[in-house]
């Protein structure tokens, strides 16, 4: 199989577990791994600390998070091509849009606890399973 495996990350340990599983799958499938982080707003904030001025940007922070995870995954899976990506919107929408954009063959998400039917999957996983343009793997990352 060639193509792309998409995985979403949000900085949590459970998301990293899903990303690690996705890297293992991408390695076995000889596929590119795209590590995706979402940001809801396009906020930019200027912060002054002493004589320093910092510009904090949501999009930049989301991409930085994806890059940090990509670096760790490259160390653990040196044969896998890992590419970070970020997008603006709800996580499930960003993941689905990226999967459509690259023609992904697999989208990997972790499960999280929610109420009702979504408790089994979590709201992001539930939405991705029902709307993704490709196969979806839900990794059991939380009970």
Predicted regions and their residues:
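A short acidic, glycine-rich active-site loop
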Residues: 52-65
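Structural beta-alpha unit
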Residues: 1, 14, 72-107, 143
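General small-molecule cofactor/ligand-binding pocket signal
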Residues: 36, 83-87, 137
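Small/aliphatic-rich secondary-structure junction motif
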Residues: 2-52
């Amino acid at each position: 199989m060639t193509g792309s495996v998409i995985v979403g990350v949000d900085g949590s340990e459970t998301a990293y577990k899903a990303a690690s599983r996705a890297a293992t799958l991408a390695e076995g499938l000889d596929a590119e791994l795209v590590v995706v982080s979402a940001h809801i707003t396009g906020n930019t904030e200027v912060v002054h600390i002493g004589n320093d001025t910092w510009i904090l940007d949501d999009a930049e922070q989301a991409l930085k998070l994806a890059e940090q995870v990509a670096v760790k995954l490259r160390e653990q899976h040196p044969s896998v091509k890992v590419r970070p990506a970020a997008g603006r919107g709800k996580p499930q929408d960003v993941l689905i849009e990226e999967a459509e954009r690259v023609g992904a063959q697999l989208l990997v998400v972790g499960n999280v606890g929610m109420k009702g039917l979504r408790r089994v999957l979590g709201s992001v996983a539930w939405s991705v399973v029902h709307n993704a343009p490709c196969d979806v793997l839900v990794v059991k990352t939380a009970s």
